[in-house]
Amino acid sequence: MLLGKDNQAIGEQTVAVILIDLVNDNDEILPSVYEDAVFYNAHSINAFYSESSYQQTWLEGDVFGWYHVSNSNACSLLDSEVFDIADADINYLDYSRYIIIFRNNPQCGGVGTSTFGKITVNTPDGEIIASIARIYTDSIYIPYDSSLTMQSTIAHEFGHSLGITGHANAYDCGSVTLTNEVQ
């Protein structure tokens, strides 16, 4: 449940988006595209959570990277490795939510994982309480007009970061999504 005045999912969410390129083909999309997709455009993750929460939750933050990692066989890195790579650019005490996007090879596939709410995280700047969403993609495309895009995966995993633990698990609602009766 996300209600209550002490809920950490209410109010401004300070977000650092960290872009990690494990492919290194110089074909990644511009960080500004991620900035717009997460924070600024009409279909942004910020707009989604702001509207869904009746303007009680909103995102503020920055995008960092691309950081190029030479191990092209890797599908991801440990969080501590990511924090070390981006340390020169980020003061980890300034953010309480992290979205790490790994651009990897096609054999790695694309999914996401996340903490459920905030956890204790060790960073080069010290111990913080933060959430971490990790997105694994072999795509350089981040459209926002389809429910099956990387942006919807980011929004989904960020929901877990806020503490949303449930899944519909592909529940078929039939022809009615909301009803007073079980179908």
PLM regions and their residue ranges:
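Active-site-proximal segment of zinc-dependent metalloprotease catalytic domains
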Residues: 1-182
